[in-house]
Amino acid sequence: ATDSEQLAYLSSTVGGERIYLDRDLVEADLTITVGEIAFDPVMGIRGTNSVLYPGLSNVEAIAKAHGQGHLELGPNDERALRQMVDEIGWLLGVQFTVQVLAGEGTSASEIFAGLDTSICNAGREALFEKSMVTSPERAEIVLIAIDQDCAGHQWNQLGAALATARSLVAKGGKVIVLSELAMEPGDGINLIRESRQARDALKPLRQQSPPDLIPATQIASIVDWAEVYLLSKLDSTLVDELFMIPLESVESVDRLLRVGDSTLFIAGGQHTFGEIAPPN
């Protein structure tokens, strides 16, 4: 968020929202956005103008945009926040952008530079081609690996990978997550630990809206749907308290894979989006 004294009024959106942004941005002669094109649980697809808002606005804008995501919507479905950030980019006069598509580990798969609209379309097409996971039916077992990307291993990556698995695994099936997560849990994650059942945490998560609202919601949603086995560097007691089953070694993963009629393997799970193909 930008300090209130450094904010300047840009304009009002079609919906009547008064937009305040960093003064240097509003008064700049030329603005070039730089960011990552990626799937996003709130916006559908993050990139181009989403780097501007709400991050470079005030605390109120950030709080208003902070949500649990939309499990029922796909990345191509219309999202009010995504429409707003694109309108803000237009109001600001942004025309040129540089965007990156994540590759394996800390590498970039593709880099795009050019006019905002054309890069948005090209990046979206590349993202779907590289990172959309489509299955004809739900699998009994989903094994999903999380790479160490530029952000390291954080709860956000775990949550994103679990959201993909939630879309692809059968009810009561098994999800096996390979991660090196060792990060301390945030307030939202701790709400799950304090609950008798994972789904009991969803309402207080909405009410309190902690900084880790999204990954906490993603975790609470999947452990109520399937058995989740986690290989990580977290303490096994913490994993148990999150209603997941801790794995101590790769050998434990091998044993789990011997059971089950159908298994889906996904690499770089934090960058993906899962969907079941519509019937013909």
Where on the chain are the PLM-derived regions?
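Active-site proximal loops enriched in glycine and acidic residues that flank catalytic Cys/His/Asp
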Residues: 100-102, 145-147, 159, 177-181, ...
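Extended hydrophobic packing segments that form well-structured cores
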Residues: 232-280
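C-terminal catalytic subdomain
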Residues: 152-229
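Structural motif
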Residues: 32-34, 141-145, 176, 264-265
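A general structural motif
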Residues: 116-135, 146, 150-160, 209-211
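Glycine-rich, anion-gripping cofactor-binding loops and their flanking helix/strand elements
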Residues: 1-27, 152-160, 202-223, 234, ...
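Glycine/threonine-rich flexible loop motifs
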Residues: 42-49, 152-157, 274-275
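Conserved, well-structured core segments that form the ligand-binding/active-site neighborhood
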Residues: 1-13, 17-138
